């Protein structure tokens, strides 16, 4: 996740690094099994960013008679307008507030390198936590097919790696193995492109 998610950051800053030596992650905690908690399969959490893709996902899932719950991290005014267009109110939503550690801001002020981080991966882990706490089994994203495409010609570097199908599959498997066995993390719009979404 970190290696591929920071691919564009490495490229723009001329940093040469390989996947095997980039980072070592160790833990000293006790191993825990994934929970067998039963989840509601008729409800779906939909992370909302504020664009047309989220509106389409919300509208289409309503047609399937799913209990749809919009989910926000630090919602903007555009985010609230999105759910209103889709026929939801603030009372229908789950909202998480996120703050950036002051130490990161201080490091930026001192001239340390700054760049894109895998924000959608943070959304993935946060929505999985919300799914567990609320007993909901489905998290439906609104990532479309172009999220898989490289943003640097002739490379596999993808500014949106954590929106890609590769990440989606990896996170789904990780969640079922270590977090929630019954959780389904998927992008509802993955098979279609932006033009097709605009038509919908």
Segments the model singles out, each with a brief description of its role:
Residues 49:
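Metallo-beta-lactamase
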Residues 1-12:
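Phosphate-/polyanion-interacting regions in eukaryotic proteins
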Residues 10-44, 52-200:
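Nucleotide-activated chemistry modules centered on ATP-dependent adenylation/adenylyltransferase
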């Amino acid at each position: 996740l970190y290696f591929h998610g920071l691919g564009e950051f490495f490229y723009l800053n001329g940093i040469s690094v390989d996947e095997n030596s980039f980072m070592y992650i160790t833990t000293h905690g006790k191993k825990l099994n994934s929970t067998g908690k039963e989840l509601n399969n008729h409800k779906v959490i939909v992370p909302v960013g504020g664009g047309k893709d989220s509106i389409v996902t919300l509208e289409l899932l309503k047609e399937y008679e799913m209990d749809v719950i919009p989910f926000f991290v630090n919602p903007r005014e555009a985010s609230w307008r999105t759910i209103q267009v889709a026929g939801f109110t603030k009372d229908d939503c789950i909202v998480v507030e996120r703050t950036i550690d002051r130490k990161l801001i201080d490091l930026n002020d001192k001239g340390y390198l700054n760049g894109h981080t895998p924000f959608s991966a943070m959304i993935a882990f946060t929505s999985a936590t919300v799914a567990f706490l609320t007993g909901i089994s489905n998290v439906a994203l609104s990532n479309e097919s172009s999220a898989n495409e490289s943003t640097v010609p002739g490379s596999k570097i993808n500014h949106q790696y954590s929106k890609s199908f590769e990440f989606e599959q990896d996170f789904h498997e990780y969640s079922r193995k270590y977090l929630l066995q019954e959780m389904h993390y998927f992008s509802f719009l993955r098979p279609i492109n932006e033009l097709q979404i605009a038509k919908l």
